[in-house]
Amino acid sequence: CIMFHILKNYIDRNFNLLSFIAVVFCFVPLFYFSTNYVLNGWSYSDALINYSEGFIRRGLLGEIIFNIHKVTNLDIQKIHAYIFIFFTIINIFLYVLILKNISNIRFVYIFLLFNPLLLFFPLNDTGGYLRKEIIILTLMIFHCYLCNKYHSDKLSLSKYFLIFKTLIIPGIIINTLIHDIQLFLIPFHFILTLNVINKDFKILSYKNTFNKKNIILLFYIFTTIPFFIFILYPVSPEKINLIIKNVLLADPQ
């Protein structure tokens, strides 16, 4: 009985840490196989698009992978796997932190943590793993975490603005260069910032439109820069074929 109470108290005190460890442990087999096998041929080939023949949409991640390969001489497939293991662990960590703040009911917490349609989706469908969307999801979860911290009075408005300008906006631009689907998710980040500025969305009323705090929203204009770059550098079949040849030379897989 005493041991039971000691164990219960330990679990209660460290529930979030244990939750994080449990989820990561569930992902270990997927992490292992991803470093030894190509789990998703389409997403792997998509990740290796790079700037070897000049600028191209979705080419940033591939450029990073090949530059790491040149510096470290690590296997390209393993570099690709390690990058996604890194971002998946970050996603799990941030997700647990958000759940810690929004759910005091243990059953709801566990349901959201192990829901097969949420964090555990890649375990149910490995085709959903190793996709660039995981990196985009990292920024979305991180922004949600910041908003949660702000509304919990654990993050000041000035600190939010600083992180917003130095991480969120550059992160959106970088993610767009990795995968152009990020352009369609800019409204998600915009609404989160809107919610920080005024949780009642009073900004939508005319008299609040020109509030000084609202100037921060103009930073979202910078997130459209990649869109215009894409227009200036259209994709051509010739360029794609040359990139494919370069990739096959470096990684026959």
Labelled PLM ranges:
Residues 96-119, 159:
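Transmembrane-helix signature of polytopic, membrane-embedded enzymes
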Residues 27-37, 211-253:
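Membrane-lumen/periplasm interface segments of specific transmembrane helices
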Residues 59, 110-138:
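Aromatic- and kink-enriched transmembrane "portal" helix at the membrane-lumen/periplasm boundary
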Residues 52-86:
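Short hydrophobic/aromatic helix or loop-helix immediately within or flanking a transmembrane segment
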Residues 186-221:
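Perimembrane helix-loop-helix junctions
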Residues 82-105, 142-146:
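Transmembrane-helix motifs of polytopic, lipid-linked glycan transferases
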Residues 162-180, 185-187, 191:
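Membrane-interface alpha helices of multi-pass inner-membrane proteins
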Residues 134-154, 164, 188, 195:
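Specific aromatic-rich, kink-prone transmembrane helix
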